[in-house]
Regions:
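Extracytoplasmic beta-strand/coil segments of soluble accessory domains associated
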Residues: 25-29, 36-37, 52-89, 113
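Short acidic/polar hinge/loop motifs at secondary-structure boundaries
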Residues: 85-112, 217
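Face-selective signature of the C-terminal outer-membrane beta-barrel domain
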Residues: 214-237, 257-404, 420, 485, ...
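Outer-membrane beta-barrel signature, preferentially recognizing the C-terminal barrel domain
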Residues: 259-263, 310, 360-368, 406, ...
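Surface-exposed extracellular loop regions of Gram-negative outer-membrane beta-barrel proteins
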Residues: 290, 341-344, 348-349, 395, ...
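C-terminal beta-signal and adjacent terminal beta-strands/loops
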Residues: 615-670
């Protein structure tokens, strides 16, 4: 099954229609066929304000900032700026591009399958944003308001400054940030017994509020024989949440949540040439985080409070040496050393009495080292091969309420093949072993009071491993049209899900081996043949089938939090002679299942629609307005009276009409 994807994808090449002419693509200059060049004129009709406005409009590309994991290698996204990723993990590619004025972009390269001097970091497709180096100074001011039906009204905005002077750049940003919550609003909750008889009905009201600040500064320029990049940032947030259930003649049930997280980071990146074909890149990253979390529940017969005080930190040192042996062959090798820690103090009080939780007080530390090597070979202009191996060793030590020390070693090979079948037709194949990183929060206790659930900590967590076989077929047409079909199969070891503990508790843990099979289709269709010269329709569909053995019942089921089906429809139309762009997005349906020993929960969304328009005045002021209607949210819960037999104690159905909201934004660059 692991390699079936490869053969199925190869069969597609015999049934796909011929590609359109190469001259319909963006200006290619002297670029290889696997690198598409997009110059500023390609985006002119949309009047972009930032580099991010340009990148999100590239046909056949979906922005990813990478995974939120420890270390740098597994967290890399698919955005590069001048051939490199940002100096700090916390400063994502989209964040950098959002504060980079569009006028500074010289060109954007869409790299499919690899290119000399480009660190793909396991990505099949990346964009490389090339910035102009001439003297410039720009300031950007943004004012925004997000107004929810029935409240709250959340103001936000930002001020950014950037300067470039013959290779030296610096900038700063101050931003007001606000949270969002897709489940707030009014609705109804109905609880039934196993026979379907109604136990009680309640009205449901969910409110939230909050806000925070984020600041960041950056500098880059020549130092010694190389180039140094420095970035640092800090942000803090306040978030409050209130969920109320009420019914005439019955006591209310109230659940509140308050979280005050903050983060600080500093990143340094230094790159220098050691010769005409040899290049060295080094990185140092330091990050800290603090969380103060309180959750309360109050109702008939219960008064509970769960508190968490958490401090975490990460230190990373990384070096990469690249040797361009020839135009066809590039070697790369290096290493990464990371230290992570997390201190957690938690308490749970129920009806005035402290409740002992497994691993409520704990400190987790990890020392992780990785060495890696990779070779990229272009057999011809149409065939490219990438082969690599990463060797990871880590030691995780836990102290506090319980102690443990464990060592892990995992080899992570990767093989990727890119084949240009025709000028506009490409096949990408990948076989790779990926190692998931453990969430330090899973080592400590946690709670979900509205779902009547307490999770104990787990000393014995192991990283989840995947053997991934993937094939992507890409067909480009009509200048900016593109269709991609993805077939993927994962063989998963040590699946991480929820396991039963003694005393009626549960915890995050490993539940054995599993599989995931994915079929995804994406289409970007230009609408010029329908009379909309700058119109386009984008369709994205993904089907996932996951299977694993339930640790409680022994039955086969899906893996928690894997959506079986997702789809989206987006329409955009640029009207350059009126300095206007408008469009809409539609999400028809999504479903998130969660399986635990004591209950099964599903979150289902239906018919989410966003309509937007943006007008750019002659003086450069851009005015944006959008209306979002979240039509239907369903929260269903089956609670069992017995774990082993999973006899239904009651079923809970929550039907919510989430609050619609309007966003208004003014942005001026000068």
């Amino acid at each position: 099954m692991k390699h079936l994807v490869f053969f199925a994808a190869l069969a597609l090449t015999s049934v796909t229609p011929a590609a359109s002419a190469q001259e319909n693509l963006p200006n290619q200059a002297e670029a290889p066929e696997n690198i598409l060049i997009f110059e500023p004129g390609f985006f002119a009709a949309a009047v972009p304000s930032s580099a991010l406005d340009m990148v999100i409009r590239i046909p056949g590309f979906s922005v990813s900032d990478g995974a939120s994991v420890r270390g740098f290698a597994g967290a890399a996204g698919n955005i590069l700026i001048n051939g490199a990723r940002p100096a700090s993990k916390a400063d994502s590619g989209t964040s950098v591009l959002s504060r980079t004025p569009a006028s500074r972009v010289e060109r954007i390269e869409l790299i499919r399958g690899g290119a000399p001097g480009i660190d793909m970091q396991g990505q099949s497709v990346v964009v490389n944003v090339i910035l102009r180096s001439e003297i410039s100074r720009q300031q950007t001011v943004t004012a925004q308001a997000t107004i929810f039906e029935g409240g709250p009204a959340l103001p936000s905005g930002s001020y950014g400054f950037s300067s470039s002077n013959n290779g030296t750049q610096w900038g700063l940003e101050l931003r007001r940030i606000v949270p969002t919550n897709t489940s707030t609003g009014v609705g109804k909750s109905t609880r039934r017994d196993a026979s379907g008889a109604i136990i009680f009905k309640e009205q449901r009201r969910h409110d939230f509020d909050g806000g925070g600040w984020r600041t960041r500064g950056n500098w880059s320029g020549p130092v010694g024989l190389g180039r140094l990049e420095i970035t640092g940032g800090y942000w803090l947030m306040r978030y409050e949440d209130e969920l109320l259930f009420s019914a005439p003649g019955s006591p209310e049930r109230l659940f509140t949540l308050k979280n005050e997280p903050s983060r600080a980071d500093l990143g340094l990146r230094y790159e220098r040439a050691l010769g005409r074909t040899l290049n060295l890149e080094t990185r140092l990253i330091q990050a800290y985080g603090w969380d103060d979390f309180t959750s309360r529940s109050l109702g008939p017969g219960f008064n509970q409070q769960f508190e968490t005080d958490r401090t975490a930190g990460e230190s990373i040192a990384r070096a990469v040496l690249r040797w361009e042996r020839s135009e066809a062959l590039t070697w790369e090798g290096g290493g990464e050393l990371a230290y992570n820690f997390m201190d957690t103090e938690q308490s749970f009080i129920s009806n005035g009495m402290p409740v002992v939780l497994p691993l409520a007080s704990t400190r987790v530390e990890e020392v992780r080292g990785e060495v890696f090597g990779q070779a990229s070979w272009s057999q011809s202009e149409r065939l490219r091969l990438e082969a690599g191996l990463r060797l990871e060793h880590s030691t995780i030590q836990q102290s506090g309420d319980a102690s443990s020390k464990r060592n892990f070693f995992y080899p992570k090979p990767r093989l990727a093949l890119t084949f240009d079948l025709h000028e506009n037709r490409q096949m990408r194949l990948r076989l790779e072993r990926e190692l998931g990183q453990l969430n330090f929060g899973d080592f400590a206790a946690s709670s979900s009071l509205p779902n009547d659930q307490l999770l104990g900590g787990n000393l014995n967590l192991r990283p989840q491993q995947r053997w991934i076989s993937e094939a992507v077929f890409e067909q480009r047409f009509d200048r900016d049209g593109v269709m991609t079909l993805t077939l993927r199969h994962d063989e998963i070891s040590d699946v991480i899900d929820v396991i039963p503990l003694d005393g009626g508790l549960t915890a995050i843990g490993n539940i054995g081996d599993g599989t995931l099979t994915r079929i995804a289709a994406n289409l970007r269709l230009p609408l010029r043949n329908l009379g909309l010269e700058q119109g386009r329709l984008t369709l994205n569909t993904q089907y996932d089938r996951s299977r694993v053995t339930d640790p409680t019942t022994g039955d086969r089921r899906a893996i928690s939090r894997v959506r079986p089906f997702t789809t989206s429809i987006n329409f955009e139309h640029d009207v350059p002679n009126r300095n206007l762009r408008w469009g809409l997005s539609y999400l028809p349906w999504s479903r998130d299942p969660t399986f635990t020993p004591d209950q099964q929960r599903t979150v289902e969304r239906r018919h989410d629609v966003t309509l937007f328009a943006e007008y750019t005045f002659e003086n450069g002021l851009a005015a944006y307005i959008s209306f979002t209607k979240w039509d239907d949210l369903r929260l269903d819960r089956d609670v069992y009276s017995d774990r082993m037999t999973q006899v239904i104690a009651f079923r809970e159905e929550q039907r919510i009409d989430p609050r619609d909201f309007v966003q208004i934004r003014l942005r001026r660059t000068f």
